[in-house]
């Protein structure tokens, strides 16, 4: 894993075309007065992302309202879906009498086409696992015939990710994400040996996840 302390737009020219398997980054949201929290020029950013990303790659970006709306609209052609990260603890106590505490953030997933997706299964209670085949009668998905197959305790992920936010006192960066959350995203969207880019490194949590999971 390589760390570069520089303006990402100064570094992009040194990254080869179609050399990146996934971009996983926590961009500035532009919601605070901090100097580092300035929204990057998104048109310029997408130009570089599209150049360096492999055709089978994906872009996974953290966001929060209102920035998530701006970010999604910046590349609607590539926008596929979003995760909701439930941080378990709310923030924004100074505004508690004007608005609800912010307990979640959005994670937007973009791709040009089919991309790597390794669903992280969880264990739950045993249930009947059914298989289904569309018939020749066409509805939204065709007429579905369910056939009970066997008992299974593997559950596919939903769009809600539950990870407690990083310990405030131990943070290196104000917007630091939990290592376990970054590992989840790296495992979901890449395979061992893949190359991952985080162009807004912060505390380097994405890099740590990649080192631990044998990604470059």
Spell out what each predicted region is.
Residues 1-216:
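Core catalytic lobe of class I
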């Amino acid at each position: 894993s390589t760390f570069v302390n520089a303006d990402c737009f100064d570094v992009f020219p040194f990254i080869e075309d179609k050399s990146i398997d996934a971009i996983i980054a926590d961009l500035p949201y532009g919601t605070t007065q901090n100097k580092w929290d300035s929204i990057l020029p998104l048109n310029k950013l997408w130009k570089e992302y599209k150049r360096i990303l492999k055709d089978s790659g994906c872009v996974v970006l953290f966001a929060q309202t209102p920035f998530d709306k701006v970010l999604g609209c910046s590349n609607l052609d590539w926008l596929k879906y979003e995760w909701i990260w439930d941080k378990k603890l709310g923030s924004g106590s100074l505004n508690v009498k004007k608005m609800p505490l912010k307990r979640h953030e959005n994670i937007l997933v973009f791709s040009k086409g089919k991309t790597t997706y390794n669903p992280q299964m969880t264990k739950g209670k045993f249930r009947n696992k059914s298989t289904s085949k569309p018939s020749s009668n066409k509805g939204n998905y065709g007429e579905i015939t369910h056939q009970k197959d066997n008992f299974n305790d593997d559950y596919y992920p939903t769009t809600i990710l539950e990870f407690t936010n990083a310990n405030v006192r131990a943070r290196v960066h104000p917007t630091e994400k939990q290592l376990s959350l970054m590992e989840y995203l790296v495992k979901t969207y890449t395979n061992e040996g893949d190359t991952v880019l985080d162009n807004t490194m912060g505390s380097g949590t994405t890099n740590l996840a990649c080192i631990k999971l044998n990604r470059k």
